[in-house]
Amino acid sequence: MKQKLLYLAAASLLSLNVQAQQDGFFTSKLEAQKKFESDYLKAVNYDQFKVHLTELTKNPHITGTPENELVKDYMVQVMSQAGMDVKVWPYDVYLPNHPGKSELQIISPVQLTLSQKEGELAEDPFSTDPRLHLGFNAFSGSGDVTAEVVYVNYGTREDFMKLVEMGVPLKGKIAIARYGGNFRGYKAKFAEQNGMIGLVVYTDPKDSGFTRGDVYPKGPFYNETTIQRGSMLTLDFTGDPLTPNRPALPLDGPIKVKRDDPATVDFHTIPVTPIGYGAAKEILSRMTGTDVPGAWQGGLPFTYKLTGGADLKVRVMVDQKPDFIRANNVVGTFIGKDHPDEWIILGSHYDAWSFGATDPNSGTAMLLTFAEALGKLYKNGQKPSRSILIGHWDAEEQGVIGSTEWVEHLRKELGAKAISYMNFDGGASGRNFGASAAPTLKKLIIDASKEVTYPDSAKTVFEIWAGKNEEPGIGNLGGGSDHIAFYMHVGIPSLSG
């Protein structure tokens, strides 16, 4: 997998370094292109991917912690040794990097405290690390509420409309929703709009769990304690919530940036807590109302109900305090020999909710290995035509913050110089290749995939990826990762793999 990704990245990037004519290259450039690709493959030390990934994921490293600072320092060291001109870009951003206080309890008809922490597994020594936090969603509202429960399916706008149509009382109730169907933040937004006072969110086994196949650690699907974390922000912009469209420069720096008053920002007001489906089962199995519509039935072995009934009371307590946190982006540059003011940018975030072995640091490790290989060529005089920038972004998990601040900081320069942006958030996850891209870069991915042999196979990545189709599907770019500011704010052609 790592070989496949490293070469796909190189093939795509190096193709952008050659003057294109219609669907191919000028003849005078083609041989140089092929030689560069061949020399790059010889320069890659694939064992370094594992070395980097092991070092990057030694500790849980959420934004603003000393452990994340160690990751930043390691990346600076590796990229500098590879010959890149490396710069750290600091920003002071407003976010929560700790769950604060959080409790979830059934108050009646029994008293039961529900787990908000993933289970410890003998097969996974990392799961016992005492530094791992409770599961939490950044930018939950704070509050302590006790109320009856309503099952809101995925918590989409349509789900809430259906509940209203069925006459289910929502005001003053606590919602329990399964992940999927929409962005998690909108589950809270729609619950608030309907007068609900709290939200419990979980991944149902029908969507990822024992009904799909073997669960972790035996298989890839969620076990009963697995908790999905993430940002709840539903503002009209990404990045630091107090500095829309302007960089959150350091508070102690020479340039002062206007910051909005947090009290004026449209943060969520209701407490939200994520849990595993084992804990959710304790609530759902005690609900006594009307049966849910057929499409709303989940994977737990009982009939789901719309309401919990008057006897079932649940307490949700969250006390989460955002604060100003120093986020550091690390950007390295190889100066292009022919067009130094034309930039091809690759990036991945490096902050993680826990250890980050897949999301995001498989992408981080790939980019470090990539930098080392290009550095060998660069030192031998084989310089790319255009400048290549590699960015490692901080504070992505709380709302795609670090990369957005950098783009806001360099908006004019990026608009004038950036040729493309390639995002590798979680570069290696499973055995199947997939990508999404701007329309102008989709053919580039297809062409690159035809040049790469699939691991342990005589077929190309393209052939495995396409299967029985003439061509594989490449999705359009949406939200959720660091391509957003490049593509949607500045209009830089982007891809995400």
Over which residues does each language-model region extend?
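Noncatalytic luminal/extracellular "stalk/propeptide" segments of secretory-pathway proteins
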Residues: 23-31, 54-171, 205, 217, ...
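Second-shell loop/turn segments in exported
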Residues: 35-43, 57-66, 103, 135-140, ...
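Short helix-loop-beta-strand segments that form the rim/entrance of peptidase-like active sites
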Residues: 51, 373-401, 421-424
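Structural recognition of the beta-strand scaffold that forms the well-ordered cores
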Residues: 52-55, 87-88, 149-152, 174-178, ...
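Soluble metallo-hydrolase cores and metallopeptidase-like ectodomains found primarily
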Residues: 127-162, 238-358, 369-372, 376-382, ...
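Metal-dependent peptidase/peptidase-like ectodomains
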Residues: 223-291, 339, 393-496
